[in-house]
């Protein structure tokens, strides 16, 4: 027997009411008196009531104006009470109650539930009766009904029944009679749902609500216990315990013994034929199973909450994935009002949220909204929007309305949202459609706040706000429960920080703070997703969503297309009014006609081919599915296997399928052979071509009318089905699918890329027609409808680019075709027709080739197949592993293909193991300011927001407060002041949320000693273990200390302030004492600590006071006319500021800025007080004299010292960041400034060792013996001292931090660039803006970064381009706040170590990185505007030589998909400090930037990529992107002169972009591009050579233009000059000089290729108008054609009078192996030794001809030991002919012995021969003058080339094609004969023949 049997028993059998308590089954309101009396009679024991819950209820009565809090606290108590009772206790209670056991003596704990029911109901009655007036009773009733509603909403059905039973008391009958019927409607509805009259079973609404509560794993569901007792009473009373078996032959076999009689109520019929009633046992078991179902749900909830408390990072990956699969979505117990749109901005599931808290917030609670500025407060109802996109509140009141404005408040409050699931869901979320993006309207009585701009939610302490005083304004009673306050900080920009304050009782406040924090965190996570288009789609959908009365509707298709970018002028239609909702066809036809007419005008004159093309879309099931909510309801499954009927009832019915054939909407018509062919597939995989052959028509087919105009005839749009889908409001899934179709159809740029990929494929991949025709869309849809299942209502962020089950489940094929036609027509109305033909598909091989070649990512075929499965929408194509254009578009638009994705970058721990001085540190200037430097507010919230951006160094300007506590503000200005302690507390809370790397607090200290001590105490008490107050590492205790690495200082806070040191207690010995003794004394003095002296270690202040910069006139900088002497022996010191001169006026010091060389070369000081010393002092004496002098200076009285004294408490916590005044660069070999250059990873060990480390920055020159002895002795003494007393070397200069303002830093970098770079390797420098930035603007930090300065403090409150550059710098390291400096600044192994000078022009001479950039198009680049005229501005922000800016053309009136196709090549010398900025500008607003993006160049991924744009304030834009193509090339310089190779070098520029497709594989190496470095003389009078970079295809004109540009002659025209190639005289001086004028269009490298065997140069000469100049030019031209040479006086190029070969190192007496030639070669002073043979030390240049059809020759740099086989392989590598077998080719040497060819005609002859194949070469030379031979495979090419005495060259030939192949074959045959023996007379012949074989001359 099942529950149906029980239900039948309960319906057919009459229940005995005398045996069932009235509180379990009240019949009607008329019976309420007897029911209450009966219930009360059961709760009286010895005439004294039982009041177990009196204290709780009295406490709750004081907060009745917070009804939700009352409901929450009632639920908390009853939840514990209900689940503490086991199911069997209900049976025990019923059995005892039926035996008349008093309630007080009933052993079952169910009696506590019965007692609570009685007390709560009596309390509710008392609350209303005790009110003094009728109005007060009505107010109390409103609050009580809100309690019932809240209990129903959260699943506490037990408390709802308890309260309703109290309202049904007979004592309230007069009150109910006094109310109008509309005032009692809500009460009647509640009673009908929870207390149905004359029903044995609960109402259907109750059953549905219980089912929803059980489906939510985290709901605190509490069923009404009386239902279970009533079922047990019915079973026990109406069913007998024993069944008597009848006699054989009797008609009735069983006889129920239901009425025991007799005196003792025993049965009078007792026999052996009785059986236990199994039906009764089964029915009792069902009731117990129902109770167990709730208990099981409770245990699951507790377990789930415990798992949520564990951080996700601690959960294993496999378990996390399993939990994600098992996570259940959000379905509240009661449908939230306004949730009909079904939109959720965040995924509401059990994995992330406590869904019970979410539903409580969405139903709303009563809170107090407080406004601190005005002091006003109001009682408001605060709700979380169903989309979780905003919160809104409005004023309510639970007191008597005295204000006439509040007459409708009670009516608003009393409206109940208690309604059945299938009814209307009320109003949608109030998302304003016309409001500009912002925070929303914020008011005291009413307002809304978008959560996208919320920054944080936190509780407020009572000492910040007087919570009790605010609460008393709204309550006459005392605070019976704790009241909490929380604030919501919001603002769009970092400096926009506004607060909204709310107050509420304890549980409401807890739910709001925890729930809102989780919602905001999840929403911020959604906003951090790289592709934010789905978030944009949801917001647009909500803004278009409408409500008209009780009917809810979303946007229609044409309204959606307008939002996507379709012009309203194109549609010529407006949004229909409410009457359009009717089924009247007239309005639909008129709007459709307007849309068609507008599209017809746009399509007028277009070709038939484009209008008929249509791309198929994903297949969809034939059956139209139900809505998302009903789908969840129908698939959520039953609560339990043994649940009764009301828990097992199905919750939904399948929707009716669409009637009719999906193809019936198309009208067949005949096709002509001239109609356009259409390949590819329709929806579901059917070929549209074959479909047309059956007479079908594409949805976007057009016909040419007699007038030549095209009329749009979109099949199906004119039929009833087409109108249905055009007029039908869109759901969110349909809205997103329509956007996806629109976005695909408008991408003509992607179509071009797709066609290019197809055209470059070796074999076209076509889908066979017959095979396509086999697949019917109908069958495919049916299969999909069977296989696909969907049970989620949240559209993920990758919905637009990856395959999900949502689209196929919710969109039918008919809808898809209609939407596809609309999208294509709307795109065609915006511009040219879109070709959507699908005749070809991409195969995995083609996709792999595209990714490997263009995207520069190495993937295999399996990865390509996976990409197809992920992105291809067509199921048939996926089965065949083919990718259509739609899939290709999705693939390129996916975030894995974005150009730069900083959101996915994680810090690399291997890059965090170097000293702090090796990093750029994200730093803030005057962090507390929100705007102007001189006026405006200060905010402690700025510290939180700045730290959350990843900043790791914040500034605190500390001043004395009037109350004895320090304050933070900008001194002597008009800015406001904030508390010091408040700032420190915020820093502690926010320091390590974004990054766990160390935070530096830069203190600008202006406080007295007393308040400094308080500062130190606050630091210690608030920060606790986070504060670094001691030296921590082994290196700190050695004589060679170093700064710790960021990884060692995780979760630590460092204080940067001045450090206190001591004055020596006794005078120093005389300077004349020994150097060793002086050094020892000085070191000991620096290591002692004194308790009596509290003065600073520096004479001057740490930093120039910003106040003086703002109040005093800034000193004008003097223009330095002298050039920067990079390698000069002496450098002038920078000017000292006025403050430094004033404070150090009487101080005797020696400026160490005077020299950057060793102390051995230092001159005596020019200071007046410095005694003259001997110039021949040893290094020790000079060094220790300086140390002693500094100590004497510190010992002198400091009467003129204006520095602030330091409290010892504050000084003790200054460890690694000791602020000092910059007084110059230290000596290179100073003991107090050791340099640790062993750049291996820093040790993280905390153990201490006595081993002293040796400094590694000693000079490379050998030191004098005395110096060595002194150092050894000193090291031993220091080691002994270290062992004796382990004390950190606190005075080491590596711990000193210098602060410079912008102007001082500029002077320092300009005058001492090399010293600045060297100093910052071991020391930290902080720079900050100068006084001219009083408006809080920023200065460019790249120049400071380029010189190694680590902390460039910027004004974070100003979101300008500089801040965007700063953000991009630290985005490449995952926003951790630390970015490793370029290796050339600190790595000794780098080629530019000690050579990198950012301001020098020589930096451009090194090999650079070439960025070939094409800005193809943009998508939605102008937010909220579709028709602007835009252009793109491209800018490289970097060092001076890399900066460049250019603009593209203007695209008129199109900001939806403008196509620019702007290509440029950017040459970048310093890639690590180069940033690419792409800005979209509006030409109609004077070039105003509407969107931009700044990215690091080295992080840009090559290939076709999308780059998300940001606002001018650097905030992400949801839907704006730039589509670009990038290609990197690495310059490989080939130097033709020795001096160039000594000055410049080839650098390997490494890129840091990440490959998301194959993260475990390294990206494809950068292609190298050969650049030939030429020298051109003649541009200057002194014959100074100009360096010019040339490519293999550069013409003479291009080289001349570059030479004039480099010479500064930009105004000169190339036609005014000639470029002359002339030969240099031989050392003997006998040969004449040859000259030739090069034609402008001749490739320059053709001339260089013919330099083999000769020494030549290029000379630039300007043409003259005088006769002598014309004659000179004419004579040179004639000499080049007639064969005669013209002798001219040679121009001295070098000291030796000849051009050096391209060598970086000279050959010094290198012996050459000439055994292969059989003779000895004289190479030391040989006349004919080619200079190329001595180039580059061990390399030389060689030119090989006849490389390929498209490459006549190749110039290589090869090693001098390279063989012919090596050269051949190198030629093929350069020519990129990897599929050639190099063993089939040989190298042929051709030389000419004709002296005439070596004269004037030689160049022209060689140039003509260079471009011909080898079989055309020999006739050009006379046979008796030309010598050819094949080089052996192992023959040395350099030696062969060195033997040339005339013109020669190497030619690459196939071994089979050369004539020497025959000779080789004959040679092998003759060699065989010789081995066998030959006659003597023939030996001479064979030896002669042998001499002509390969390897020797012929």
Swiss-Prot record:
Swiss-Prot/TrEMBL cofactor(s): Ca(2+)
Residues in PI-PLC Y-box domain copies: 1279-1385
Domain PI-PLC X-box as annotated: residue spans: 910-1058
Catalytic site: 925, 970
Domain C2: 1391-1517
Region annotation (Disordered) ranges: 419-444, 569-722, 1082-1178, 1238-1274, 1680-1711
Physiological role: The production of the second messenger molecules diacylglycerol (DAG) and inositol 1,4,5-trisphosphate (IP3) is mediated by activated phosphatidylinositol-specific phospholipase C enzymes. plc-1 is a bifunctional enzyme which also regulates small GTPases of the Ras superfamily through its Ras guanine-exchange factor (RasGEF) activity.
Subunit structure, as described in the record: Interacts (via Ras-associating domain 1) with let-60 (in GTP-bound form).
UniProt protein name: 1-phosphatidylinositol 4,5-bisphosphate phosphodiesterase epsilon-1
Species: Caenorhabditis elegans
Encoding gene per record: plc-1
